[in-house]
Every structure is written in structure tokens, then in C-alpha cells.
Amino acid sequence: MIGIDIVSIGRISRLKERHGELFLRRFLSEDELALAKSDASIAGLWAAKEAASKALGVGIGAECSFFDIIIEKSPKNAPILKFSPKIYENFNIKEATLSISHDAGFAIAVAIVS
């Protein structure tokens, strides 16, 4: 399945300004916080998790939380999509790929899960 999400970097900036680190901790793990170096990268992580949940066909909710979706970086700085053991088992995931981009005030992510 394929999931896509786009988010305004300005929207993420406003949420971060209003709620500070509480906003970030709502959807990012400690390791992911280290990847959140700019508002654009934070927006990319948000879009990535939303896209991954859509690729599962459920969205963010009871079946799949933000913390069931894990975003890492390869040595070449490419995004790596992983899931919690529960998600791998419940959705029988064999492979997952992710692309994130940001330009013109938006971040977009595409996730493919099979």
C-alpha cells in the first residue's frame, strides 16, 4: 500500500511555538527528536508518520500510534521506515520504504508498505 501526506511547515512552526517541546514529544521518540533540527525536518517527520499510517490503511489512532512508527536515517542521510513489533505482526509487513522532501513551505512524505 502507498501512503502520502503533505503538511505546511508554517503550521508545524506555529504548533511548536505555541506548545514547545510538548508538541514534539507528542509524536517523536527520543531518537527522532535528535533528527528534528529545523521546522522543515520536524514537518517532514510529521508527514512521514502520517504517510506511513495511511499506507497501513488505518491512519494514526488506536491501531497505530505515532510511536508505533519509527523514523531513522541511513549513513547517507536517507530516511528509514520501521515499525513497532506489534505493527509488523498485525499488518504482516515484509518491507517498508519512505521518501521525505520539503520545498516552498511544505513537507511531503510518501511511504510504501508491503
Swiss-Prot record:
Describe the reaction catalysed, as an equation: apo-[ACP] + CoA = holo-[ACP] + adenosine 3',5'-bisphosphate + H(+)
At which positions is Mg(2+) bound?
5, 50
Q: Which residues cross the membrane?
A: none
Which key words tag this protein in UniProt? Answer: Cytoplasm, Fatty acid biosynthesis, Fatty acid metabolism, Lipid biosynthesis, Lipid metabolism, Magnesium, Metal-binding, Transferase
Q: Name one GO cellular component term.
A: cytoplasm
Family, per the entry? Belongs to the P-Pant transferase superfamily. AcpS family.
Q: What is its main location?
A: cytoplasm
Single biological process term from Gene Ontology: fatty acid biosynthetic process
Q: Which Gene3D superfamilies match?
A: 4'-phosphopantetheinyl transferase domain
> Pfam family example for this protein?
ACPS
In terms of NCBIfam families, this protein maps to: acpS, pantethn_trn
User: What this chain does, per the record?
Assistant: Transfers the 4'-phosphopantetheine moiety from coenzyme A to a Ser of acyl-carrier-protein.
UniProt-annotated location(s): Cytoplasm
Q: Which GO terms describe its molecular function?
A: holo-[acyl-carrier-protein] synthase activity; magnesium ion binding
**What's its EC?**
2.7.8.7
The organism sits in which domain of life? Bacteria
Task: Write down what this protein is called.
Answer: Holo-[acyl-carrier-protein] synthase
As cofactor, the record names: Mg(2+)
